[in-house]
Design a protein with these regions (language model features):
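C-terminal alpha-helical cap of glycosyltransferases
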Residues: 366-381
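Catalytic binding pocket for nucleotide-activated donors in carbohydrate/polymer assembly enzymes
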Residues: 288-361
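Donor nucleotide-activated moiety binding/catalytic core segment of transferases
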Residues: 81-98, 246-291, 324
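A donor-sugar binding/catalytic signature common to diverse glycosyltransferases
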Residues: 99-130, 269-314
Length: 381
């Protein structure tokens, strides 16, 4: 009963804010930014936010966040930041001319005050897996709710894409007018060529496995022998940094074993894009990060240990896996170690294929994506 009452109060409150958003005039020089439900300061929104703060003082840029630790960090950097759904956040949102997000307005900011503002959807990367409407078209129930509660409709003004190939997928996935999709490149990729932050003489690889929603998956189930892997990496002079999804975390016993390794590092990077250039090669299975890593023209090793199961149990892919993954495919840790060694001996082995796929999915590689996105936003305000 309390849950129903709370939902009704939220709806009434939302209706009031939605009506106010019709009345209160928007200020085109106030832009609000958010990312990943307010829990992270990362991704495309972060990089555009910092670009605007640095280069366009005429714009009042504000970050909206749920995480109070992040708020403190940003305040210490002299950024303007408010807690999501706080009175200050709602009041400034009612006046903001641009809502800039990485996931969607409801999650990253607040959907209620967004009427008459320009919604800029930066998204969070080129999709290999099918997304949004391409996965599940809206049900009649969802359509009815959006009709009854019009503020639930996210009317995107600009959706940024990295290439014309990516734009084709976004048209169907978002169900959006193609004219609203702008090929600008992703703001986060402007920092890919930044100076290295992890300094060591040894070679370094970053391993980014994808979370499986429909079934349990553990990368260490596929012929992983701790001592063999440790010795092999030592002999090659290679460190592997593995970022696991929280739900894929190994048990405590296995984590203790991994913590004794000198060459395997389980890490949690808040913003992987700020350090991608530090690594000599990337290991992944289905993570769309590799589309960005292509810009560095470094080796990529694909480790789809459970490829057949993934394709049958998880979301469909937009492409034939082998046609858009320019690099060797490892079926287990034994093959993965062999491919790491091969990539160190012949780093240019797949370079032509890397360039082919890079050019298909990335139109720009000039570190001016933020500038292009900024110009597109200004054009519609």
């Amino acid at each position: 009963m309390l849950r129903i009452i709370k939902s009704l109060i939220n709806l009434i409150f939302g209706d009031i804010i939605f009506l106010l958003s019709y009345i209160i005039p928007k200020n085109d020089n106030i832009w609000i930014f958010g990312s990943w439900g307010g829990e992270k300061y990362s991704d495309n929104s972060k990089y555009l936010f910092e670009y605007v703060n640095k280069n366009h003082p005429e714009i009042r840029s504000i970050w909206i966040v749920k995480n109070k630790k992040i708020r403190k960090i940003l305040e210490n950097k002299n950024y303007e930041v408010y807690i999501k759904n706080s009175l200050k956040a709602i009041l400034i949102s009612l006046r903001a001319g641009a809502f800039i997000v990485t996931v969607n307005v409801a999650r990253d900011l607040n959907i209620y005050p967004s009427k008459n503002a320009k919604i800029v959807q930066l998204w969070h990367g080129t999709p290999l897996k099918k997304i949004l409407i391409d996965v599940k078209p809206p049900s009649q129930k969802i359509k009815l709710l959006k009709f009854l509660f019009p503020y639930l409709n996210e009317n995107i003004s600009i959706l940024t894409a990295a290439s014309s190939e990516v734009k084709k997928k976004y048209i169907t996935a978002f169900g959006i007018d193609p004219e609203r999709i702008k090929i600008t490149g992703y703001p986060r990729n402007d920092g890919l060529h930044s100076p290295k932050k992890i300094t060591t003489d040894d070679k370094k690889g970053i391993y980014l496995p994808t979370f499986r929603k429909e079934y349990n998956y553990n990368i260490f189930q596929y012929n992983f022998n701790f001592q063999k892997v440790e010795n092999s990496l030592k002999n090659m002079g290679v460190h592997i940094y593995i970022q696991l999804h929280p739900l894929d975390d190994p048990d405590n016993k296995f984590r203790r074993l991994l913590s004794s390794s000198k060459f395997i590092h389980i890490v949690e990077f808040d913003d992987v894009y700020s350090i991608l250039n530090d690594f000599d090669f990337l290991i992944t299975d289905f993570s769309s990060v590799y589309f960005d890593y292509l810009l560095l023209e470094k080796p990529i090793i694909f480790a789809p240990f459970d490829l057949e199961t993934y394709l049958s149990e998880e979301r469909e892919l937009y492409y034939d896996y082998y046609s858009v993954t320019p690099g060797p495919k490892a079926k287990d840790w034994n093959e993965l170690l062999d491919e790491i060694e091969e990539s160190l001996r012949k780093p240019e082995k797949y370079l032509n294929d890397i360039k082919r796929v890079k050019n298909l999915f990335n139109k720009y590689d000039d570190c001016e994506n933020c500038q292009r996105v900024f110009n597109e936003i200004k054009n519609i305000l």
